[in-house]
């Protein structure tokens, strides 16, 4: 049975149980109980997670919402150029495991959310896609699954997935992973 490692922020934490339920009879699905937060945090913690979970066959990973978050109301936590450099380093570490790596784009916020700007989220996603293309890593375009449906798929906190969003995004992840099993 192939081992799938799910890494990412709280959006990943939203859909991970759905993915586990759908794939547990076809693959060993493992995931950090910890929020992988922003790219620099993932880069720092990745060696420990790989040690804990062992070598995966497949990694489905995302970072970006924390990086694009305006915690102080002024600027994103991580400048997009730094975000891209950190993703590059994470990509290299993940590829060195021999796993098939899939990067998931960040999902949008509801437009009325003052802490995120969807134009910026798209800018971060474009930077991420460029890094992944350069590294031969497939991209799961989760932004597109939610875009246009933010009111239907996101909670009242304006950023996290609700039940319907978990099903839609979770199924998009299952579909990509199923093709690799």
Please give the residue ranges for each predicted region.
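Short beta->alpha junction loops
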Residues: 31-38
């Amino acid at each position: 049975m192939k081992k799938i490692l799910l890494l990412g922020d709280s959006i990943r934490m939203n859909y991970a149980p759905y993915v586990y339920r759908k794939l547990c009879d076809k693959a060993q699905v493992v995931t950090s109980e910890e929020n992988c937060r922003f790219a620099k945090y993932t880069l720092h913690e990745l060696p420990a997670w790989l040690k804990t979970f062992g070598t995966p066959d497949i990694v489905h990973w995302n970072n970006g919402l924390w990086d694009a978050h305006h915690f102080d109301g002024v600027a994103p936590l991580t400048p997009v150029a730094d975000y891209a450099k950190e993703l590059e380093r994470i990509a290299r570490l993940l590829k060195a495991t021999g796993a098939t790596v899939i990067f998931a784009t960040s999902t949008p916020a509801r437009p009325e959310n003052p802490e995120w700007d969807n134009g910026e989220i798209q800018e971060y996603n474009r930077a991420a896609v460029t890094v992944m293309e350069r590294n031969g890593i497939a991209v799961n375009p989760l932004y597109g699954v939610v875009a246009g449906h933010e009111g239907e798929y996101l909670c009242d906190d304006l950023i996290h997935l609700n039940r319907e969003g978990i099903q839609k995004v979770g199924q998009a992840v299952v579909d990509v992973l199923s093709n690799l099993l």
